[in-house]
Each structure stands twice: as structure tokens, then as C-alpha cells.
Amino acid sequence: VEKWLGLALKDGYRERVMLVWQCGAYRRDYKTSMQQFDESLRRVGTDRFDIWSFGELIYDNDPEWLDDHGGLDAAQEARDEKRIVGIGFSGHKAPHIHMKLLQRGFAWDLVQMPLNPLDATYRSFERQVLPEAVKRGIAVISTKPIAGGAIARAKVVKPEDALRYCFSLPVSSVQCAADDRALLKKNLKLATTYTPYHAGEMDLVRQKCRPVAGDGRFERYKSTQEFDSPLGLAVHGFRP
């Protein structure tokens, strides 16, 4: 995938995009983090990424591992060498882990979190983490805007209404997968033509979702290991 990305960024397109690199070194150690970083630069065919983002910070000891195992040192070294500009992190499971990272005293540049109308009711990143990130001036990327497709299965709001809900939050970008060009074009059109929901409309969308959102049945990535990576499970002592 990174090689394909490199091909797409030739002929001047690299300067027109912001590249966020997600570090998949789940032991959070210096050596593996830096090795993966260098390999990704080579595959993409660039000398820098804009943001280094630590992926899948979902275990309570992940914040300590970043410090104790040297992963954060690797990112700071890459920034000192001007091979990245900013440092961030992502996770999909527990708002309190995001808060733990935000409150550790490190000046994060980016945070990625699952935001959608279901999240507002269940273990909510929108209510617990988003205000703190905004207060600190940290850029936010909304992930899982349709809850991995669960919004469509829940049949309480349309997927396009869920996207519009996320676009109306104080975020820098919304990350939404598309499995074909038609859906991609539809999402892009919505992103460039939507009218933000006002506060009353946001509340109405939340209310529509509340009856099926409270037990987390449509956000199982928060409460189960079904969506955790095999490598992440293994390094934390779980059987993938």
C-alpha cells in the first residue's frame, strides 16, 4: 500500500498533501519504531512524513510503554532531524487512556479518536476527550464516523447524516473508508457541500441513536478484542 501511495504522490502531489504515518510498533520500543519509520519512508519514496502517529494505544499500560520502551524518544529524534513535523496518537477503545496521554505533559500535535452519533452515548470520546483536545489546541481526526458500518445496520440515522454529524464537530478531518469510487465521490461531495448541524440538530441526531447506543452493541471495538490487531494482542500477552 505504501508503494502505491508513493506512486500517487509523484509529479508534485507530495507537496499538496499532509502525510500521517502510523507507527505499528506495538511494543512501543525505540528500535522497532525507528526501523518501521525508515522502511515506510523508503517504500513511499519520500524523505519525510508530516505527522508520526502512534497507532492503537488501547491498553492501560501503553502510555507508560511509550516512555519506558523508547518509542516516544524515536519520534522526538525524527522530529529533531526534521523528518517529521508533529507527533500524535490514535486509539479506539477507552476515553480514559486518551485522557491519560493528554495529561502526561507531552505537547501532542494530533489525536485520532472514534467520533460518531453512537459514541455520544457510550464511553464517549466526544464528551470526555474532544473538549480537552480542543482546549489544548491539538488537531483532531475523527475515525469510525459510521462506526465501522454499524450506523447502517442500526438503522436509526443515515450514514450521510452520521458523516454530517462528524463534519459538524470541532475536528480537523474525518477519516472514512470507501470500498468503491462511487462511495468515495459521494463522501467527498458531502464533505465539500454540507451545511453544519446547529446545536439543536446535533442533539436530535444523538437522541435518535440513544436507544441502541447505550449498551455498546454497535461499538464493539470499545468493549471487545475483536477489532484489536493480532500483534497488539500478542505483545500484551493475549492470544490473537
Segments from the language model and where they lie:
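Short, well-ordered alpha-helical microsegments
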Residues: 1-5, 94-99, 181-184
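N-terminal binding-site loop/beta-alpha segment at the start of enzyme catalytic domains
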Residues: 1-17, 74
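Active-site phosphate/pyrophosphate- and oxyanion-stabilizing loops and adjacent acidic/basic residues
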Residues: 3-7, 38, 99-100, 164
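Short hydrophobic/aromatic-enriched beta-strand-loop microsegments
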Residues: 15-19, 107-114, 195-201
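N-terminal small/glycine-rich loop or linker at the start of catalytic domains
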Residues: 16-23, 53-56
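Glycine/proline-rich, positively charged
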Residues: 27-128, 134-141
